[in-house]
């Protein structure tokens, strides 16, 4: 990477007792900013730790000396040094007098976005997320140069604080052929964004620091006009935008949706859920946690949907190694590789997983097929399994063996106790709904009892319903609560041993269909056409799960259809 920082021009505006120690400092190439507060010693901040530069305190005269050497401060208390990328920010007292300065070093780092160059070539809108000082503006500046010079696109930069292209009327060469639009007042940024589209015919618009609801709305308007957007926002994780009502529109917005009784039961969720409101303004989101390691969400739409449903999406970690090579890895968000940078998300997802007891996601060829997303009650499955390597692993579906506390409402305790004893299930009945992990009730009683539904909703407890208080229905419900049917007693490795590839593929297809039926009690799943010998193998597997199957159609298109119990 080539770095240009014009550090000497920044040092020229500093008082001599601040400038001289920095000139002689061995680590000045890594200087982040210089902080000068009235009545305090000057401080230099480096990536490792801050250091005091002098024993002398900053006076009014020292601050006035610096202010006179920089441009005028704008409405957001920012100024700059002409033809440089440095930013000078001021702190004022109640009378409006400057009592502190933050002199931040601006650097043009050429080659820093090689890690995401393939994403730029796709033409999708990109949102960069990260805490202050992590390098978002530096990355945006280099993106502007690459898009305008190397990809020859018409690029317009909305430079509200003159931080991307520097202070003055002539933009810094680091942005290449990109054009820069300055903003007279920071609160008018959204108007300048719309003006850029209407007047200057850009192919790409670059915005730094989207922070208000009007700016988020303007970004959405620009995206709907077919212009590629590259923007930055403060926030460590993509989940931060979901919780931020001001910026939620950037990822499509979040809304409460009330489901019908049947739909809520089929999904295994409460009736009131969160869903994405519209298509996101940015198709790609990048979390910058470190200057050399970025986490990429290539499909924001799918990632947001998975997060709202309580699933753990796959994340893509891109890292620049010491030899300059780029290492790209894909992990579930629960991976230890991203644990240090996504701990808050992990805690939220793990708690959801413990409460809902959903099936674990199944990984096939580095992709995750979420069985809860297959909503059609009569569907063909092989579109997800044809020409896909089969993962033969007897631990691919695990049953949670922890003890579950069950609250039974309007049901016979004697019947439930007899089923638990006969099957030796890890379930304890409780009379306190607050301590329960699940609720089992008659369907007719649940519809009439709004208080029960409210308590379950507030405590995030799933209500399992049955039609009648019979032993078979209670048995099926208890098995569903424990996900017992998701793991057969069959030894999967032994079953597939000495089988040919197409035979294993057919068994894998049947197994996936069985799990869909277990999740959606009323589902009917149709398999793809197979020979009589293969259909017999599938029949034997289905019988082991105590489900019904029937062949229909004419040869050679005869196939199985699997029914619930």
From Swiss-Prot:
Binding locations of ATP: 130-137
GO molecular function terms attached to this record: ATP binding; ATP hydrolysis activity; nucleic acid binding
Keyword Plastid: yes
Gene3D superfamilies the UniProt entry points to: P-loop containing nucleotide triphosphate hydrolases (3.40.50.300)
Cross-referenced CDD domains: AAA, R3H_AAA
Short name of one Pfam family: Spore_III_AA
Location relative to the cell: Plastid, Chloroplast
InterPro entries noted in UniProt: AAA+_ATPase, P-loop_NTPase, R3H_AAA, R3H_dom, R3H_dom_sf, Spore_III_AA_AAA+_ATPase
Keywords on record: ATP-binding, Chloroplast, Nucleotide-binding, Plastid
R3H domain mapped to chain residues: 503-565
Gene Ontology cellular component terms for the protein in this record: chloroplast
Top-level division of the source organism's lineage: Eukaryota
Keyword tRNA processing recorded: no
Family label: Belongs to the ycf45 family.
Protein name, per record: Uncharacterized protein ycf45
The organism's taxonomic lineage, starting at the top: Eukaryota, Rhodophyta, Bangiophyceae, Bangiales, Bangiaceae
């Amino acid at each position: 990477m080539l770095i240009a920082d014009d550090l000497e021009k920044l040092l020229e505006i500093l008082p001599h007792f601040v400038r001289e120690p920095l000139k002689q400092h061995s680590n000045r190439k890594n200087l982040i900013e210089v902080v000068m507060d009235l009545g305090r010693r000057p401080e230099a901040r480096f990536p490792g730790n801050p250091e005091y530069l002098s024993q002398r305190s900053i006076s009014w005269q020292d601050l006035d000396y610096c202010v006179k050497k920089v441009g005028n401060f704008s409405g957001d208390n920012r100024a700059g040094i002409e033809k440089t990328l440095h930013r000078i920010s001021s702190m004022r007292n109640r009378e409006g007098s400057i009592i502190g300065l933050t002199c931040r070093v601006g650097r043009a780092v050429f080659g820093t976005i090689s890690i995401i160059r393939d994403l730029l070539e796709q033409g999708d809108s990109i949102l960069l997320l990260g805490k202050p000082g992590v390098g978002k503006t530096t990355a945006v500046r280099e993106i502007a140069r690459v898009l305008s010079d190397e990809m020859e696109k018409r690029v317009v930069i909305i430079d509200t604080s003159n931080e991307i292209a520097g202070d003055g009327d002539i933009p810094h060469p680091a942005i290449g052929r990109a054009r820069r639009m300055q903003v007279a007042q920071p609160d008018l940024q959204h108007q300048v964004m719309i003006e850029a589209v209407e007047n200057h015919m850009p192919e790409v618009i670059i915005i730094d620091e989207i922070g208000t609801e009007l700016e988020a709305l303007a970004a959405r308007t620009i995206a709907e006009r077919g212009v590629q957007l590259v923007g930055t926002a403060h926030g460590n994780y993509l989940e931060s935008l979901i919780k931020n009502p001001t910026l939620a529109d950037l990822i499509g917005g979040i809304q409460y949706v009330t489901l019908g009784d049947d739909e809520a039961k089929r999904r295994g969720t409460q009736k009131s859920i969160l869903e994405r409101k519209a298509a996101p303004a940015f198709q790609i989101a990048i979390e910058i946690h470190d200057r050399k390691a970025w986490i990429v969400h290539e499909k924001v739409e799918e990632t947001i949907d998975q997060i709202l449903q309580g699933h753990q999406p796959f994340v893509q970690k891109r890292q620049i190694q010491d030899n300059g090579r780029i290492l790209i890895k894909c992990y579930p968000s629960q991976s230890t590789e991203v644990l240090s940078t996504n701990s808050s998300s992990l805690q939220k997802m793990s708690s959801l997983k413990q409460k809902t007891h959903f099936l674990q996601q199944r990984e096939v060829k580095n992709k995750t097929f979420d069985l809860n997303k297959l909503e059609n009650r009569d569907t063909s499955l092989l579109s997800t399994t044809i020409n896909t390597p089969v993962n033969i692993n007897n631990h691919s579906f695990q049953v949670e063996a922890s003890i579950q506390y069950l609250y039974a409402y309007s049901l016979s305790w004697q019947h439930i106790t007899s089923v638990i004893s006969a099957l030796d299930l890890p379930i304890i009945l409780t009379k306190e709904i607050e301590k329960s992990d699940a609720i089992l009730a008659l369907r007719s009683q649940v519809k009439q009892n709004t208080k029960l539904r409210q308590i379950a909703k507030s405590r995030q407890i799933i209500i399992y319903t049955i039609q009648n208080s019979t032993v078979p229905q209670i048995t099926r419900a208890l098995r569903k609560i424990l996900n017992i049917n998701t793991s057969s007693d069959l030894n999967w490795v032994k079953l597939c041993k000495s089988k040919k590839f197409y035979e294993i593929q057919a068994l894998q297809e049947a197994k996936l269909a069985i799990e869909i039926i277990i999740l959606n009690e009323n589902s009917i799943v149709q398999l793809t056409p197979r020979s009589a010998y293969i259909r017999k193998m599938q029949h034997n597997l289905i019988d082991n799960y105590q489900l019904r199957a029937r062949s229909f159609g004419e040869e050679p298109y005869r196939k199985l259809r699997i029914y619930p119990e």
